[in-house]
Amino acid sequence: MTTKPSDSVSWFQVLQRGQHYMKTWPADKRLAPVFPENRVATATRFGIRFMPPLAIFTLTWQIALGGQLGPAIATALFACGLPLQGLWWLGKRAITPLPPTLLQWFHEVRNKLAEAGQAVAPVEQTPTYQSLADVLKRAFKQLDKTFLDDL
């Protein structure tokens, strides 16, 4: 994944964009064979929910049994770092420009929205995966479910 050099964002902004991208991406099974976002978002949501309690349990378990503190902390940090890796990947993916094949598909979906009478904002810069997620989410809400079959 390559990003534009002008897209220098801080690591915290990348995590925030990843969370926004995860919430925006439509969780439709028909997109799963083409895009890994469904799997990454599912794993990240799972990690956000279950890894912090697992880290606390692991830490208290090893301390209670008289284990060493170093490995206990390392295990807890590893468990808490897993969801951050998912958010990081999603954030980087969100700011990545679309490749030419997806760019064409992006414009086809936008045209379908425009043909259906929906107001579509003009594209001001190179569309990214976040732009694609926004368009797909809107298309799934406002178009019939067969719009993917025509593309």
UniProtKB/Swiss-Prot annotation:
Subcellular location as annotated: Cell inner membrane
Transmembrane segments: 46-66, 69-89
Keyword list, A-Z: Cell inner membrane, Cell membrane, Membrane, Transmembrane, Transmembrane helix
Keyword Zinc-finger assigned: no
Protein family according to the UniProt entry: Belongs to the UPF0208 family.
UniProt xrefs under InterPro entries: UPF0208
Membrane topology qualifier: Multi-pass membrane protein
Parts forming coiled coils: none
Protein's recorded name: UPF0208 membrane protein YE1335
Name of one Pfam family that matches: DUF412
HAMAP family assigned to the protein according to its UniProt record, in alphabetical order: UPF0208
This protein's GO CC annotations: plasma membrane
